Amino acid sequence: DKDESILLREYSPYKVDNKNIILFFHGGGYVLNSVFTHDDMVAYFSEKLRTRIFSLDYKLAPENKFPEALENAIQAVKWLEDKNISCENISLCGDSAGGHLAASLTHHFTNEDKKIHSQFLMYPMCDPNCDSESHKIFGDKYFLTNQAMKWFWKHLQKDEIDMTDEMFNLLLINKKITANHTFIITAGFDPLHDEAEKYASLLHNMNNN
């Protein structure tokens, strides 16, 4: 049911010193976690940044395949706009799968020629092929493994054609995005390291900030 309600939790700090808001998406490979698992993190960000944050409890795979979570995110932005929050004052943020969802939403708005304030991606999932050098080096020695990432992507993917969609495979982006700024954090001993670096390089080469 496309009209089914989804949870969007608001965090309001003791003091707000800007008119922007952050729309946050939690990580967990699109299969795990919720707004509740990331509650402390988002509350901390809100207080330290003195910024209102809305955290979205998007629908998880495998019951909800691509692009269900993206459609939830689009719905959340429409709700914020109905509350007189301009898209140009919205920063999209997320960790891992949440970073992928934030970037996917940026790509969606780029295709609609709609500007957003920024995107802030923490060790984002970017490439469903999972075959970068960092996947080979760090893919079986640390917390997140190459096999786990393949499992997450498999549960998210609906059809083979998804692999040709820039909102599924972020590395297919071939145009300047409409986010004013992009911030990307990578982790050193992480299978996702190289794909996030490559995504950053692609954006830089297309004159993104």
Language-model features, listed with the residues they occupy:
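Alpha/beta-hydrolase superfamily serine-hydrolase fold, recognizing
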Residues: 2-209
